[in-house]
Amino acid sequence: MKSTERLIFHIDVNSAFLSWESARRVSQGLPDLREIPSCVGGDPKKRTGIVVAKSIPAKKYGIQTGEPVAMALRKCPNLVIVPSDFELYDKCSRAFKAICASFAPVMESFSIDEVFLDMTGTSLIYPDPVAAAHELKDKIHRELGFTVNVGISTNKLLAKMASDFQKPDRVHTLFPDEIQEKMWPLPIRNLLFLGKASEQKLLNQGIRTIGDLARERASNVQYWLGEKTGHQLWQYARGIDDSPVKAVPDEAKGFSVETTFNDDITSIEQVFPILLEQCDVLATRMRRKDKKCNCISVTFRTLDFRNRSHQTKLENATDLTDEIYINATRLFKEFWKGQPLRLIGVALTGLTDGTYEQMSLFEDTENKERRRKLDAAMDEIRMKFGNDKITRASIMNSNARIGRKAKAQMKNENTEEQ
């Protein structure tokens, strides 16, 4: 490759949750879960218990990620099941990312078990990218006890596609001159970011492989999938992606809170009080900093340990708790499909000066002013007497609370401002 071209690595932990549990057990002299039929999953007696990670021997029994643990046990009665351990996953993820960060000037954390490295300009240190990838892969295995795949290319899309090739413990390249040979023959469902609905639409048009999509006219793809989605996926099929590797998100600094649950959250009646308390905490913090937000994001984590995030841009910036909560609940209802949840979070970004307000001719100004006075009254009570001295009734009546962390942050802000 040319020295002026970008060089991107994508590193993905192989069966992360199972591998991390296995590494711990091996260090304790216990059997390696990767070598026996095993899985990480919930309690088989619970309806919501599912397989979130499985070993290769378990896969040979037909056990699938996402299926009920009870079904997996019917397929393999001697299946070893271990419970999820969030503290272990966080510890292993941090150690994994620390090693990756030591290899490149810029690292982007893509998920708990994936990172992108921008290796551009490191040719004097690592003249052979493949050798460098092997060095990184082997260092992780040697020091942490689990394996990774490394994908190498000139952009993030192709690097991630490459890391999904044969597993485990492999290094793969997918440079632009390798696309036709390595990527185009793959089934269309293998294309990164292609959803099931778009896949079905393409199959209905006779598009079976990534190469079929790449060779199709862009205008046809846009007609089938919509202008924006169609254009993006057509470009992806041709290996085109100019997104940068970002060490931090490029969104404006904002306020956020997340709540992790020991037990599954399964009903919308459980979710709404949690969202209200989160929005209440964040809006209070934001008003104390004299800010308003233009963007509201809601994140939730399902039993496969993947976060789903969705956001909405507001027509006018706001700092009102009720407005933020209404938008957060709308977002959640639009995107939640009823899966059991282990985490819910809200983020407020796109911050503006709180003293500026854009007026609308059609806005219910009387109702808005009433809500503003309510927020101001609650803010004053909390500032004078403490954050726990006043709480909304719907939150008090709920047994799901967001915990101490967010409120501790509010307490610290009180101290700073006094």
List each model region and its residues:
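A glycine-rich phosphate-binding loop feature that marks nucleotide/adenosyl-phosphate handling sites
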Residues: 154-157, 235-238, 292-302, 341-352, ...
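Gly/Gly-Pro- and Ser/Thr-rich, intrinsically disordered tail segments characteristic of DNA damage-repair
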Residues: 1-232, 238, 242, 284, ...
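Short, charged/polar surface micro-motifs in flexible loops or helix N-caps
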Residues: 14-16, 44-47, 303-306, 351-354
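C-terminal hydrophobic structural anchor segments
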Residues: 318-319, 323, 329-383
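DNA-contacting surface of Y-family translesion DNA polymerases
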Residues: 2-3, 190, 198-341
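Short, hydrophobic beta-strand segments
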Residues: 115-121, 309-312, 358-364
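Short small-residue beta-strand/loop micro-motif enriched in glycine and branched aliphatics
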Residues: 81, 306-310, 355-357
